[in-house]
């Protein structure tokens, strides 16, 4: 009999393509089901997600379906935490497949390390076996696309970090610092983990544990996601009272550089050459990554697809970040519905 009761919370919305395999990976855990509860908090899905989950709730007593009429992730997390009973609270995502030792390993290290939050390495996989989907998955996990987050590029040893995907928390963390910020449709985990470390909490990345996360399956969905990430980042910084890092400005500066540089290049040959050089460098880096990926996956079109996908990520995030700054300066509301 395990000592710790684990409450697993999964915010979901229109996940009919992926939710069954997520649930099956949870049912395959080597942690006793008597010591687990799995709470699927649904944002009132309009596809078959609720029917699929309901089929499982009818068969397994430790699986429950909870309504989230507010739709967004932070509301789902908070409702799940309030309804949960475990002394360990674990968040998962319906787009992921988890190794069978996921729950047991995170629970063990949470207590062995004396940590407040622990998490696994995030391996991004293609939604479908197409060139576009592979390009999205590669760009969404490459440092050139998304920066050098430890949980995305991986580490060799257990290490402290500023955030982990999803997370496994001690329940007392929420009693100490509160719940997730419902203003943050995106980036609520970044804000929460920063709040946790500001209160002296510790977060560890467990590198031997890898989860497979399914990337967005279209360029449009990918752009919407990165726009929202960029949009809410300035609000996170404002709430935490933290200055923005230089790296956060790069996509916005890239966007402004394309717009302003394109205009100014009409009046100066020097600016035109500088403008062309920056665009060429960005394209060259994307093509170089594309060449390596094309050889590995035997998909030659990745050579031209990767620069396109990288550019869309950077421009979408940059546009979102610029819009986020505008909303803060103009005191506008951040009304965005999170969806796939």
Regions found by a protein language model. Name each.
Residues 4-7, 37, 191:
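Cell-envelope/extracellular polymer assembly enzymes that use nucleotide-activated donors
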Residues 68-84, 105, 164:
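Glycine-rich, basic loop-to-helix element that forms the pyrophosphate-binding segment
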Residues 89:
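Short aromatic/hydrophobic "clamp" motif used to bind/position activated sugar donors
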Residues 101-134, 138, 209-210, 214:
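Conserved donor NDP-sugar-binding/catalytic core segment of glycosyltransferases
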Residues 254-329:
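Membrane-embedded multi-pass helical conduit in multi-pass membrane proteins
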């Amino acid at each position: 009999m395990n000592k710790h009761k684990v409450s697993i919370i999964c915010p979901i919305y229109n996940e009919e393509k992926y939710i069954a395999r997520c649930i099956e990976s949870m049912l395959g855990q080597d942690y006793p089901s008597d010591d687990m509860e799995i709470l699927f908090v649904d944002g009132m899905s309009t596809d078959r997600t609720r029917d699929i989950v309901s089929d499982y709730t009818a068969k397994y007593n430790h699986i429950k379906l909870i309504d989230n009429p507010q739709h967004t992730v932070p509301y789902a997390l908070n409702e799940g935490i309030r309804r949960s009973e475990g002394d360990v609270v674990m968040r998962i995502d319906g787009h992921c497949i988890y190794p069978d030792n996921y729950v047991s390993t995170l629970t063990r290290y949470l207590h062995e390390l004396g940590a407040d939050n622990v998490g696994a390495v995030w391996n991004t996989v293609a939604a479908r076996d197409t060139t576009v989907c592979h390009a999205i998955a590669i760009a969404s996990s490459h440092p050139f696309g998304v920066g050098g987050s430890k949980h995305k590029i991986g580490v060799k040893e257990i290490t402290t970090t500023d955030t982990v995907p999803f997370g496994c928390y001690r329940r007392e963390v929420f009693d100490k610092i509160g719940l997730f910020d419902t203003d943050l449709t995106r980036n609520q985990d970044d804000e929460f983990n920063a709040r946790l470390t500001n209160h002296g909490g510790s977060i560890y990345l467990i590198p031997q544990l890898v989860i497979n996360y399914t990337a967005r399956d279209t360029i449009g969905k990918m752009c919407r996601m990165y726009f929202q990430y960029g949009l809410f980042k300035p609000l996170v910084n404002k709430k935490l009272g933290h200055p923005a890092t230089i790296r956060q400005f790069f996509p916005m500066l890239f966007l402004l550089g394309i717009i302003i540089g394109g205009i100014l290049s009409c009046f100066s040959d020097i600016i035109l050459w500088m403008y062309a050089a920056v665009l060429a460098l960005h394209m060259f880096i994307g093509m170089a990554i594309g060449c390596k990926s094309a050889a590995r996956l035997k998909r030659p079109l990745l050579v031209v697809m990767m620069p396109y996908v990288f550019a869309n990520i950077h421009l979408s995030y940059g546009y979102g970040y610029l819009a986020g700054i505008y909303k803060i300066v103009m005191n506008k509301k951040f009304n965005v519905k999170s969806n796939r």
